[in-house]
């Protein structure tokens, strides 16, 4: 993989990771256009540059992640409740993460096989686009933006759909899950960003470990520049993408993303029917 190819893939990652449009589908198209061979390192690279995207969330929402005020309702209720309230966001993220950890571990081999099918990605991308045309009507936005522990768990269950249906988009699944729980578009999107941090960090570390087992430390030394550049570019682009997405989603809803998904999914299907070789 060249530096230029790494930069292009990182731009695609940064633009699509937090939008409900399937970063996997876009990576397939980008790799196909550039003629990037789907080696074990390339597959690892597309996961490991998620670390840059994770950092963009931590930077943009640093006050939410790294400030630990006691909730007013917990003041004077004892040290236990005050402690729990300080880390309320972390407890909710932990609860939301549990379903994906359990199901991902139990069905890891099956998930890997599904993820390796470009047809599955393309069809799910296309059908998910049709569904998104109706999301705003199915789950009317609410001003009740508070996320409770049960709501966090349900959103975590929705995240599992993206694990078993590559091409669905983790962002789409969790945001729709939040709206189904009567959260506002903004609250649902922001919790989706927050949940991406432990989810994607876990996936990145797991992929790095597997790559290490396969090629040892030398494979990281050999591709250090590509990995570093990829993460920096993904970080910068994701910063802009998140800011754009929050404003656009709050104002216009999901329909535009639905049409876009249909277009991209349809393009993948046409390319494969035309005999173009594509790989995840």
UniProtKB/Swiss-Prot annotation:
Membrane topology field: Multi-pass membrane protein
Gene Ontology molecular function terms on file: undecaprenyl-diphosphatase activity
UniProt xrefs under InterPro entries: UppP
GO cellular component terms listed in the entry, alphabetical order: plasma membrane
GO biological process: cell wall organization; peptidoglycan biosynthetic process; regulation of cell shape; response to antibiotic
Subcellular location: Cell inner membrane
Reactions accelerated catalytically: di-trans,octa-cis-undecaprenyl diphosphate + H2O = di-trans,octa-cis-undecaprenyl phosphate + phosphate + H(+)
Role noted for this protein: Catalyzes the dephosphorylation of undecaprenyl diphosphate (UPP). Confers resistance to bacitracin.
Remarks, miscellaneous: Bacitracin is thought to be involved in the inhibition of peptidoglycan synthesis by sequestering undecaprenyl diphosphate, thereby reducing the pool of lipid carrier available.
Protein name: Undecaprenyl-diphosphatase
